[in-house]
Amino acid sequence: MNSLEIFLNIALGKNKFAILVVEKKKIIFFKEQELLNHGKRIIHENFDEILRKSILEIEAKFRISLNKINLMIEQEILESVDATIKKNFENKKIDKKSVEYLIQDLRFQVIKSNPEKQFIHIIIRKCFVDDDEYNTVPIGENCKVFSVEICFIYIPKKFLEELEFFLKKNQLDIKRIISTNYAKSLLNKDTENLGSAAVAVTQDINLKEVNIYRKNRVKYGFFERIFRIFV
């Protein structure tokens, strides 16, 4: 069953924990439970116990050894940082490498300025060429000024570190961190369906999103997508 994807969703405002198993875009296991709230802290021994029991249940049911999960965080209000970066092309042609470096530079600046934040999604908002908005990056076109607006979705790094402590206790690594709020926004309908949201975000539906991997590494292949279309 190598095609199984495991999703762990933590709803911060609702103090709920859900675990899903997805196979070929189909939800084949779903379990949701309440979490005890110790003040503002919901990630504690209660979570550890529920997580351990859920892991054992899934491993027994599907005869697998569970060691990686997709972590989904559902916030009361989506938290993000918006930023813009420009480059003067001096009436030269726009080239792919310059655009790549431009976006990477903005990403590094935002991360450096916000050390307490863990950025989990990077979304291309708009692209401008000499103040004209474009739906695609016009590679090869002469340009004075090129600019791009980007949204950086984040969760508090302290919360993530606390959560990772309990995951490691259960021999679990994080494959991908997902904003549940953002994942639900990708759906055309039924936006409260957690299972559909989990599936949607793994299918790279939003071509404007930069793929982020653990250890702050960006999948450079995303640039091939932003040159095609903005949605």
Per-region residue spans from a language model:
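Nucleotide/phosphate-binding catalytic cleft detector across ATP-hydrolyzing
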Residues: 1-15, 23-65, 73-231
